[in-house]
Amino acid sequence: MVPETSDLLLEIGVEELPASFVEAALRALPELCKKRFAELRLVHGDVHAYGTPRRLTLIVEKLARHQPDLEEEVTGPPVKAAFKDGAPTKAAEAFATKLGCAIADLRRVETPKGEYLVGTRREVGQPTMAHLPAALVQMTLAIPFRKSMRWGAGTVAFGRPIQWLVALLGEEVIDLEIAGIKSGTTSRSHRFLRGPGVTPNGEVTITNAATYLDTLRAAHVIADPEERARLMRERLLSAAKEAGGVLIEDDFLIHENLSLVEEPHVIVGGYEKEFLELPERVILEVAKGHQRYFGLRSPDGSLMPNYLAVVNTAENPALIRRGNDITMRARLSDARFFYGEDTKTPLATRREKLSGIVFQKRLGTVLAKAERIERLARELGLLLMLPEPTLMAAASGAHLAKCDLVCLMVGEFPELEGEMGKAYALKQGVSPEVAAVIKEHYSPKGAGDSTAASDAGALVAMADRLDTLVGCFAIGLTPTGAADPYGLRRACLGVLRTMLDRGFDLRLTDAFRAAYDGFALVKLDLSRDDLVKKLGEFFSDRLKGLLEAKLPSDAVQACLAVVSDRPLDARARAEAIAHLDAATRAGVGEVFKRATNIAGNAPAGEPGMPADEAHPSEKAAYQAFLALRERLGHLARSGDFDGAFRDIAAFAPLLAQYFVDVMVMADDLKLRESRLRLMRAISETCGTLARLDLLGG
């Protein structure tokens, strides 16, 4: 018999929640629901969470209207504790009482831990409605907020005061109460806008979960965040077109505005053209960082003296625009003042002020760090044998790289670090190549950001991150769990991505040693060798994850087991192995696993030529190996890993047949030793390219 089901709706109406509170609640609600309903044995379909600043909503599809009966086996106390001299003890009596059965109904069961009493717990399922009030109250009060508040004389804590509750199973009201608010069918429309079916004071009746989104949409509330985001983008594009411009799209701003409005409306604002004399990025940052406004470009690509603001109402647009314009002009005026003051002083002369900023109390000031970066960038360039002009550009860029940190503009807009350094450098006559280094050395800023576009910028970017990594690791400031205050994981990935993107074939150990030497005047906790070992493991873990995002895991692990110190080399080998299909990799892995295991007992030395009477498979494998060994040496030296692994894959079936036809551990000790040497030679020769025994795992 198919159980009867109904859709569940819970809407928690609140005073305006901060955007981050809405997002956190919508992440938590479905999991809280699934967990509680699992505990109650309530079967259900899909679970959805919707929300705006004024409401958090849970919809559960096809919730069973009745619990199933429960019958489960429960293990109780050990028999030796349950009975004494044949009579039941209090332990046995308590266990029987818990299960609601007689002691005679309990069974003795032998387990690995001894003999235990076992009984059956039976529970008749109850109507779902009997459990829902308490369950929904529990879920609601379990929603995590960064900071909760109490209101009135009550003791309930929530993100913001609860204003109304709608709770329905099908079309039946679930009777519950939280903080003096009783549930019903009455929700609220948009705070300022009304629609059909909405009372003058903004009340709207919800009849069931199926029509909930449509009912609110008619009341100017877009409860589904995904729908709200789509509508916001459509209206932004439309407003930009009407203004004669092109929207500067920004997913971050869509996300930022999403939980600030219940129905997105767009207003076009503007400011004086004179402000366009500021660097474009400054204007966009003023609009984005402080106001959450979108920028506009003219069809020719130049910035327009306009912005788009997402607002929560279509009423009084002129009044809203006037207020927004006043605020935008004030912010731009501040930025123009900062820019004017900053450009009065050459960037290079600001460098000494970096001595007043502490990078890390044991590792010194930002000036000390800047000096280490300048030295290290050249060391890395020499290790990579880059041309002298690149080294000079890197050195000049590194010298200026941190100077904008003491500028007024960066003090107000930290997101513009590097960007302003580049702008000021260009304005003061620094070459474009050097100015670009100032900006590029902050790249990548995150997983979605590109790495430095020039070799000089890449050198300084790597030097900056390596200095931080080596310094922090050397004084014990390593990431622990989710805590990574110095962003060391991100810095590590930045170094690796830069090396791979620029094609820098650099040994990590050489880079670590060069960076460590820059701390000669700092008392460190780790020796250079210990630092290199510990940081090498940290990098290897990150490199593994980076490569496995695009390449088969077995190929990556096989290569990192051999060349984790050279990321570019490791990637090239893993890519070559990945060109072999999964079945081929598995076959190679299987035969080399066997060869490697056997080789562990093998003596050193050149394998002997098989005797004339040897099995053809033994002769074929031996001759093929000699040819393979010669080819692999040439292919590896030339970097032709595709050819090398193709040859190994072609050799694998011969080795597999060898194992079928030949007994390696022959009774003849001399013959056994020769065959063992062959296994060792095969394993060691091919093992210089990758741990082939790890393939196919």
Regions found by a protein language model. Give the residues of each.
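Amphipathic alpha-helical "coupling" segments that flank catalytic cores
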Residues: 1-697
